[in-house]
Amino acid sequence: TRAQNAAFLWRAAGCPEPKGTKLPFTDVPAGSWFEKAVCWAYEQGITAGTTKTTFSPDTTCTRGQVVTFLWRMHGSPEPNSTKSPFTDIKNSDYFYKASLWAQEQDITAGTSKTAFSPNMTCTRGQIVTFLYRDMAEE
């Protein structure tokens, strides 16, 4: 879920204390297990929510969303390439640069040589694998 993904990233970053707990999201309850993670992710620009007032913590994440969160966690670096090996993404997709970056960093090779499957649900196992590969590079 989006809450789990935020928590995974927050923990991978060392559980930094957010500057505050004031969020625009009405669906992140004070004291919830994911509140600090979402606050941190929001402050870092990793997520802006699904609307101005909702985070949608129980919504599943897609592969496109997960690599975008991870890419933003790294400061949204420009990928080295501008051409994707994946035929199922367009350069106008919000996750385009994130998917290029993740592929270049060996975080993901896609679901085949030519498919990234950006709209496929990203499982907990896949999220942890992406994080493991990302952290192995550091």
Question: What do the PLM-derived regions correspond to, one by one?
Answer:
Residues R2-K36, T47-G64, R72-K97, A109-R124, ...:
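Feature responds to low-complexity, polar/acidic, surface-exposed segments characteristic
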